[in-house]
């Protein structure tokens, strides 16, 4: 049963209530000249996205969006409010979101002196919003559920290889569905991954350069299959100041991929017992120089 935390702020406008859901995926916030003019929340119920009502009025300043990762949830909302000339009561002037994993949004709106925080005393999960709105947002409250088994934030294992190129980081997801590896004459030229997030396919960016050799694909039997380790090698290649990744091999709970690339140089393995790989990061130029992973504990 969700706990309804009373709305605070002013008494203007009309009451609105999105109710309680399983979680929050996105919050769209619109700013006016005097404060927060608009809010619209995308919730999740099971694997379905539910778009809440549009509360307040959009302005020419536009809309900003705070997105919550699939393995994270909002635990607190800091709200500022003030009495502004032209309004009969206090209005909401800014909103700042904080999550379980320590992610904090910028303040959306104009940060003023009067503050309150919407949260559950045991660090519960925010699952809905309610409040008052007219031409602007007057009051804001929330629904929380007590989380008896908090989500574990993903752990980032350091990348290995040579310190050259531009850093990239796909972040952490629910799992990995497909791996694409592009090979060059001297090493791995490019990588790209298809992830799962909330039962949706998320196609990651392509990191590196295409070659005439094209991409090779390694597909997992997701969700029953997951990557448990990545083996590889890196070596110093003529034409590059530091080492390049010249081979990658992916191990799952069911099988092992063929080696992609040429096995030579220093060997490495990226893994942690009892964990699955849910994201990748590294450094790249014309070839892949570094490769690292994000991991989460395996749960039944």
UniProtKB/Swiss-Prot annotation:
The keyword Acetylation applies. Transmembrane segments: none annotated. Gene3D superfamilies: Jacalin-like lectin domain. Involved in gametophytic development. PROSITE patterns: JACALIN_LECTIN (PS51752). The modification N-acetylalanine is found at residue 2. It comes from Arabidopsis thaliana. One of its GO terms (biological process) is embryo development ending in seed dormancy. The gene is JAL32. This is Jacalin-related lectin 32. InterPro entries: Jacalin-like_lectin_dom, Jacalin-like_lectin_dom_plant, Jacalin-like_lectin_dom_sf. Belongs to the jacalin lectin family. One of its GO terms (molecular function) is carbohydrate binding. Keywords: Acetylation, Developmental protein, Lectin, Repeat. Residues 2-146, 154-297 form the Jacalin-type lectin domain. Pfam families: Jacalin. Disruption phenotype: Defects in female gametophyte development. Arrested during endosperm development.
């Amino acid at each position: 049963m969700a706990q309804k935390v009373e709305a605070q702020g002013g008494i203007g406008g009309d009451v609105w209530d999105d109710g309680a859901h399983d979680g929050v995926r996105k919050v769209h916030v619109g700013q006016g000249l005097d404060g927060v003019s608009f809010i619209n929340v995308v919730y999740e119920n099971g694997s379905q996205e539910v778009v809440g009502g549009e509360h307040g009025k959009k302005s020419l300043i536009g809309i900003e969006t705070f997105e919550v990762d699939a393995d994270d949830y909002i635990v607190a909302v800091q709200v500022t409010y003030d009495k502004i000339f032209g309004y009969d009561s206090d209005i909401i002037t800014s909103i700042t979101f904080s999550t379980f994993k320590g992610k904090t949004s910028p303040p959306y709106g104009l940060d003023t002196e009067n503050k309150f925080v919407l949260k559950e005393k045991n660090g519960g999960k925010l699952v809905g919003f309610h409040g008052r709105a007219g031409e602007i947002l007057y009051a804001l409250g929330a629904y929380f559920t007590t989380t008896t088994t908090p989500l574990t934030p993903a752990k980032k294992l350091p990348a290995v290889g040579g310190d050259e190129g531009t850093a990239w980081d796909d972040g952490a997801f629910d799992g990995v569905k497909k791996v694409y590896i592009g090979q060059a004459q001297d090493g791995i030229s490019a990588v790209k991954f298809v992830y799962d997030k909330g039962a949706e396919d998320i196609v990651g960016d392509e990191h590196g350069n295409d070659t005439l050799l094209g991409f090779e694909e390694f597909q997992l039997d997701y969700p029953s299959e997951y990557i448990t380790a990545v083996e590889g090698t890196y070596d110093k290649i003529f034409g590059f100041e530091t080492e390049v990744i010249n081979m990658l091999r992916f191990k799952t709970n069911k099988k092992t991929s063929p080696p992609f690339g040429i096995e030579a140089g220093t060997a490495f393995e990226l893994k942690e017992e009892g964990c699955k790989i849910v994201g990748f990061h590294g450094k790249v130029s014309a070839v892949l120089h570094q490769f690292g992973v994000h991991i989460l504990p395996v749960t039944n």
